[in-house]
């Protein structure tokens, strides 16, 4: 009975190990594994590779060429007033997004305000006509001053943290000073889109924000709306989605929301992918835009040919900073080295237009995966006995198969299965179970060796340990083969030997016979004078029959 109490029931061991996967579930739910999970999502993007989108996105770069040709920031808005009409009217693009907040904050008073105001008026005049141009608004500046000099504190208003009693401050919006004398005489365009992302990253962005002034949609949402030809009042916000609805009531597309507000961006390609991301310098576009009005017919013809390129036709154009000196860079799932963040808007537009949204399982399903995979892998990994190596290999193959399935589901269905929590829970629980199993096996081996080490061979002891069964102290019925041996005429010649030589002879004889019996899988029962009693088939059955064996009797004579 003592042996049975020494080994705790199997269910008790697993019950004590159950908190391990639960802790991993809590860590996953609290977002403490997000960094590692995001890294594994990046690997899945790279495993999947580049995919195509049903919308053309062209990037007009504010790059080193543009900065060296036009000059350093801030530019006169005249340059934008010339480029935008050329892209929309001449090139036939569907919409343009300008990834720069047209703000008068931080502009030096020493600049030529006459020229700046002239440029502001020219761009304001064009934008007031309502072209499909989305200008940028942002919460990037947390502290600002309004026209009265009052400090304004801004932070991105998230719906999950919103308090109904505290209306959020609006973002910093475009403002054009249109008076040389009065700095407070400002004009702002009506079509404005947010350019913010969560934590300045490239994975998630707010589809909209409610403020005390109005609701602002993300620039990518506005560009997608223009692409589909939906009116501003056709954008309907619900708890878990946004609908684009035409005037006749038909649904154009539905944008699923994460946390009632967020869009998770599906990246379609690396930044340096000419086929997916055609790019051209702002300086080049500006030069050709100016050539459209040249007196030289050859220049006008060259400009018309430039804007007639098929890449422009019905494309979405994004104008944004790409020069590293402008410090608008971030890493992406495809690019470990930071690249221009204007690519966020391009991939977000592609996500909305294509409908290829990243999908995640419900929380309950994620937790079920963690617990289920942990139980399966741990049971296999902790299995002992003769099949222990095979079951451990099966556990490793099961984990490998899960990782492969996670990559395939992402590749084929854009579904994100959790990896960090399931793998972490399976590894840690399996490790703890294996260590526990080893400790129990060592204790079991010690008990069996203590009981049978003098009677059975080491190989048989190992077999008893591997069998996982405790010795049955109460006895049991089984078929065994008994073995008896003694020395012929022992009484006669023992009288002729002295006690010393007799003891030496008996030790040598009994040791040799015992070794031979144990080598054949037998178990020593006892010594009776010069006789030895042994048995075959207990405490464990023989793996082979005794038929045809060479009996130890021939070796003990």
What is each model feature region?
Residues 59, 97, 204, 264, ...:
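Structured core elements
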Residues 41-43, 296-302, 462-467:
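Short gly/ser/thr-rich secondary-structure transition/capping motifs
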Residues 224, 319, 349, 457, ...:
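Conserved hydrophobic/aromatic pocket- or pore-lining residues that grip, position, or stack substrates
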Residues 362-435:
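Transmembrane alpha-helical segments that form the functional core of multipass membrane systems
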Residues 237, 241-297, 301:
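Substrate-access "cap/lid" subdomains that shape
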Residues 419-478, 504:
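Regulatory cytosolic signal-relay segments
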Residues 471-552:
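Catalytic NTP-binding/metal-coordinating core of nucleotidyl cyclase/transferase enzymes
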Residues 2-258, 309-391:
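Non-transmembrane functional regions of envelope-associated proteins
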């Amino acid at each position: 009975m003592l042996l049975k109490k020494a080994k705790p029931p199997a269910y008790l061991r697993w019950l004590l190990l159950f908190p391990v996967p639960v802790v991993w579930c809590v860590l996953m739910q609290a977002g403490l594994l997000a960094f590692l999970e995001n890294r594994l999502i990046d690997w899945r993007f790279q495993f999947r590779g580049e995919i195509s989108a049903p919308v053309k996105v062209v990037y007009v770069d504010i790059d080193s060429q543009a900065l060296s040709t036009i000059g350093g920031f801030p530019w006169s808005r005249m340059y934008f007033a010339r480029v935008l009409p050329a892209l929309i009217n001449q090139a036939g693009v569907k919409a343009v997004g300008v990834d720069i907040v047209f703000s008068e904050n931080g502009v030096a008073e020493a600049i030529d305000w006459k020229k700046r105001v002239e440029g502001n008026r020219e761009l304001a005049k064009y934008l007031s006509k309502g072209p499909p141009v989305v200008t940028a608004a942002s919460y990037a500046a947390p502290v600002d001053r309004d026209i009265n000099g009052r400090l304004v504190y801004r932070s991105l208003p998230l719906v999950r943290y919103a308090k109904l009693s505290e209306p959020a401050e609006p973002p910093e919006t475009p403002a054009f000073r249109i008076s040389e004398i009065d700095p407070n005489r400002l004009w702002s365009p009506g079509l404005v889109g947010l350019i913010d992302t969560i934590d300045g990253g490239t994975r998630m962005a707010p589809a909209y924000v409610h403020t005390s002034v109005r609701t602002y949609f993300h620039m990518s949402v506005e560009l997608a709306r223009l692409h589909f030809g939906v009116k501003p009042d056709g954008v309907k916000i619900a708890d878990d989605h946004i609908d684009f609805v035409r005037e006749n009531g038909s649904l154009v597309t539905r944008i699923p929301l994460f946390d009632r507000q967020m869009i998770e961006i599906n990246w379609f390609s690396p930044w340096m992918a000419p086929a997916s991301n055609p790019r051209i310098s702002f300086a080049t576009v500006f030069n050709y835009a100016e050539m459209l009005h040249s007196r030289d017919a050859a220049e006008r013809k060259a400009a018309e040919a430039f804007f007639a390129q098929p890449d422009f036709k019905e494309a979405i154009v994004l104008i944004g900073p790409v020069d590293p000196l402008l410090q608008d860079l971030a890493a992406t799932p495809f690019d470990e080295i930071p690249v221009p963040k204007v690519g966020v808007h391009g991939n977000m537009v592609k996500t909305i237009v294509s409908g290829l949204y990243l999908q995640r399982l419900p929380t309950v399903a994620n937790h079920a995966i963690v617990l289920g995979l942990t139980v399966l892998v741990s049971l296999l990994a902790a299995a002992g006995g003769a099949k222990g190596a095979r079951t451990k290999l099966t556990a490793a193959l099961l984990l490998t198969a899960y990782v492969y399935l996670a990559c395939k589901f992402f590749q084929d269905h854009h579904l994100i299965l959790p990896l960090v929590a399931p793998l972490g829970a399976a590894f840690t629980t399996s490790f703890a179970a294996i260590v526990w199993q080893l400790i129990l096996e060592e204790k079991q081996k010690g008990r069996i060796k203590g009981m049978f080490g003098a009677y059975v061979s080491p190989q048989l002891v190992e077999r008893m340990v591997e069998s996982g069964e405790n010795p049955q102290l109460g006895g049991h019925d089984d078929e065994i083969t008994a073995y008896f041996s003694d020395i012929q005429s022992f009484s006669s010649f023992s009288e002729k030997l002295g006690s010393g030589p007799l003891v030496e002879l008996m030790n040598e004889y009994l040791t040799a016979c015992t070794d031979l019996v144990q080598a054949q899988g037998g178990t020593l029962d006892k010594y009776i004078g010069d006789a030895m009693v042994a048995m075959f088939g207990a405490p464990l059955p023989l793996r082979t029959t005794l038929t045809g064996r060479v009996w130890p009797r021939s070796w003990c004579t």
